[in-house]
Regions:
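C-terminal interaction appendages of subunits in large macromolecular complexes
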Residues: 2-187
Length: 187
């Protein structure tokens, strides 16, 4: 999964400075995946499993707020889980309302410009927390994202821990610098 480059570089520097650093200590530098569409990662156990075993799964939720507008509540979604298509999400919500699987929604509209803004207008008598929980349950506003830290090691695919990935990266960089230096000396 994508990560914040600054956090990854900080983690690499931490491993170089302290070769005995544990995964828990490394997680203070590399806190978890950083998805471009945002979303909220629910819990740390999935990240911890992925970083310690090379496999894990995380639950991503859309970032949504309940607002009051003209004596009615509405749910405003400002971030969606990674790889979720906003237009398909809106269409799916409308289908669920039409089929009667989710009650309390009067309309949806996409007010996005530069940033995501999906507005879900609620009926007057609707409980916004119940509607929001149903949206998480029945739509991709809550999604599971599997993590496999897979890389080629000696031309063979191998599942690595976070620490092993960083160690292989550092070894690769040392090899590149050694070869470049030897090439320059041989000129």
């Amino acid at each position: 999964p994508p990560h914040n480059l600054t956090e990854v570089v900080d983690g690499i520097i931490a491993v170089i400075d302290d070769p005995m650093i544990t995964t828990e200590e490394l997680m203070t530098h590399i806190q978890g995946p950083d998805f471009p569409t945002g979303g909220v990662i629910m819990g740390k156990s999935g990240i911890r499993n992925a970083y310690t075993t090379g496999r894990g799964k995380i639950i991503l939720r859309a970032k949504a707020e309940i607002e009051e507008h003209n004596d009615r509540n509405r749910i405003v979604v400002t971030e969606i889980p990674y790889q979720v298509n906003k237009a398909k999400l809106e269409k799916h919500i409308n289908e669920l309302v039409r089929d009667g699987k989710i009650d309390g929604i009067s309309s949806t509209r996409d007010e996005s410009t530069e940033h995501i803004r999906l507005v879900i207008e609620l009926k007057r008598d609707a409980n916004p927390n119940v509607v929001l929980n149903n949206l998480f349950k029945y739509t991709q506003m809550q999604d599971t994202f599997g993590i496999i830290l897979l890389a080629l090691v000696d031309k063979q695919p191998k599942i690595l821990t976070l620490r092993e990935m960083i160690d292989y990266y550092i070894a690769h960089q040392e090899d590149v610098i050694s070869r470049r230096t030897q090439f320059e000396l041989d000129k």
